[in-house]
Swiss-Prot record:
Taxonomic placement: Eukaryota, Viridiplantae, Streptophyta, Embryophyta, Tracheophyta
Role summary: Usually encoded in the trnK tRNA gene intron. Probably assists in splicing its own and other chloroplast group II introns.
GO biological process: mRNA processing; RNA splicing; tRNA processing
HAMAP family, sorted: MatK
GO cellular component, one term: chloroplast
Species of the source: Sciadopitys verticillata (Japanese umbrella-pine)
Top-level lineage group: Eukaryota
Gene label: matK
Subcellular localization(s) per the UniProt record: Plastid, Chloroplast
Protein name according to UniProt: Maturase K
């Protein structure tokens, strides 16, 4: 990175840096393999792996065979086993992909850095729950929400064309093209789609493809939204790598005073707020139904012209916030009217006014959580707790810690839900399932377990000091305030699984 920065300071085009020779540096594969070790439970020292199983000469041969583009490209699994040295061909191919991602990220990071540094209004947050206060502030003032599912079935040449804009190293582009085409033409036709969808097993190469694709998508889309919007402000937020939330406030255009108020109402475009997390995007608009349909039409045209994608209509859903709910980040989102009574006393007169405001009501899918618990054998489908037989071989501390971790993650993720009474029913299921698991392990009853452990069962597991929303139950539903927990870096796995099911509908 420092060397590339020096070349850039010498007025050399940094896009022309030769990245391909870096692929033949042995240290690069050590970095890629070390990164793979961090993500797995494999604990063998790296030097042992390099000395016993790693053959740098084999990696060079694999790269040459990939570039030849013959009928026995190594990624298809037809490589000569004699060329492998105590290591199968798939592992070497994955190592090459990881190393190619490491090299490409150097150029990609240098490209995106000036773009982010040039925007002084960007603010970064590490919690995904910074998104919910943003939505709580903006959604009540809008009336339509457009649920966008970013297309991922994209032709390899479109990706290569995207990479050519910021990577002008021809050998690296040829290698990337060969890998993408072979991936597409292999026996599994969904390989490339799996590489672009943020789901399942995430490799460095798949995340690099997805981030570069979404970066290109948003670098074109957001300026178009800014240009088409004549509102006073445009706000957008997204998560590039699942951990960063960016919010931008930019003043665009102010209408001239010569235009009358009625003409302003006819000419003014809707307020547009753009939000994204992984493959889900939300366009929140304030306008008429005709304007929202026009926005949807232009999005389809944008996909066709920029990425040659003919997306299906189900990729963009339009919901009216006052009538329908939209699922996002494991919540059901809706906007409801909230009546307020304002009393103002002036001298001897008392004025009482009734005001109606809108408020965001995020709802946790309690019934879906119970179904997931039934699938994992914590309860039956009706919600009656049962013992977790698979955990009876663990120690008491491990059992308590596991139940405590499940409750803590769920409680933190759904801390801002409007139906928090349902969370305490989830707590009851986990608490009783924990007691039944311990009773089954010791071949006793729940009463005996409670007498032996005493308060430890309820203090070590489901610690009360973590629960900061209990005071909200003393209030009425109209006075309840939403408390968002700000220390969550990614979506809860259970909520993520439920969200994927909603995406397929």
């Amino acid at each position: 990175m420092d060397k590339f920065q020096i070349d850039k300071n010498k007025h050399r085009p940094w896009q022309q840096c030769f990245l391909y020779p870096v692929l033949f540096q042995e240290d690069l594969y050590a970095i890629a393999h070390d990164n793979d070790l961090d993500k797995s439970s494999f604990s063998e020292p790296l030097e042992n792996f390099l000395s016993k199983e790693f053959s740098f000469l084999t990696v060079k041969r694999l790269i040459r065979r990939i570039r030849q583009q013959n009928n026995s490209i190594v990624l298809s699994g037809n490589c000569d086993p004699n060329e492998m040295i105590n290591r199968n061909q798939n592992s070497y191919s994955e190592l090459i992909l990881e190393s190619l991602a490491v090299v490409s990220e150097v150029s990609f990071s240098m490209r995106s850095k000036p773009f982010l540094e040039g925007i002084n209004e960007w603010k970064s947050f590490r919690s995904i729950h910074c998104l919910f206060p943003f939505m709580e502030d903006k959604l009540p003032h809008t009336n339509y929400i457009s649920d966008i599912r970013i297309p991922y079935s994209i032709h390899p040449e479109i990706l290569v064309r995207t990479f050519r804009r910021w990577m002008r190293d021809v050998p690296s582009l040829h290698l990337l093209r060969s890998i993408l085409h072979e991936w597409r033409d292999s026996s599994s036709t969904e390989n490339l789609q799996k590489a672009l969808v943020v789901s399942g097993e995430k490799t460095k190469f798949s995340l690099f493809l997805w981030n570069s694709y979404v970066y290109e998508w948003e670098s074109i889309l957001i300026p178009l939204l800014k240009r088409s919007s004549h509102s006073r402000s445009l706000l957008s937020g997204f998560f590039p790598d699942r951990t960063l939330f960016d919010q931008k406030i930019k003043h665009i255009v102010v209408f001239p005073h010569q235009i009358s108020t009625k003409r302003i109402w006819l000419l003014k475009d809707p307020f547009i707020h753009y939000l994204r997390y992984e493959e889900r995007s939300l366009l929140v608009l304030k306008g008429t139904q005709l304007q929202v349909k026009k926005c949807r039409y232009h999005l389809f045209k944008f996909w066709q012209c920029s990425f040659h994608l003919w997306a299906q209509p189900y990729r963009i859903w339009i919901h009216e916030l006052s009538k329908n709910c939209s699922s996002f980040l494991g919540y059901f989102l809706s906007v409801k009217m909230k009546p307020l009574v304002v009393r103002a006393k002036m001298l001897d007169r008392l004025f009482i006014n009734d005001l109606i405001t809108n408020e965001l009501r995020p709802i946790a899918p309690i019934s879906s959580i119970i179904r997931f618990f039934a699938k994992e054998r914590f309860c039956v489908i009706s919600g009656r707790p049962i013992s977790k037989l698979a955990w009876t071989s663990l120690t008491d501390d491990d059992i308590l810690d596991r139940f405590d971790r499940i409750w803590r993650n769920l409680f933190h993720h759904y801390s801002g839900s409007f139906n928090q009474e349902g969370l305490y029913y989830i707590k009851y299921i986990l608490l009783l399932s924990c007691a039944k698991t311990l009773a089954c392990k010791h071949k006793s009853t729940i009463r005996v377990v409670r007498e032996e452990l005493g308060s430890e069962l309820f203090t070590k597991s489901f610690s009360k000091k973590r629960e900061f929303i209990s005071s909200s139950f003393s209030k009425t539903s109209s006075q309840r305030e939403l408390n968002w927990n700000g220390d969550i870096l990614q979506i809860n796995p259970l909520a993520n699984s439920w969200q994927k099911i909603q995406n397929k509908k």
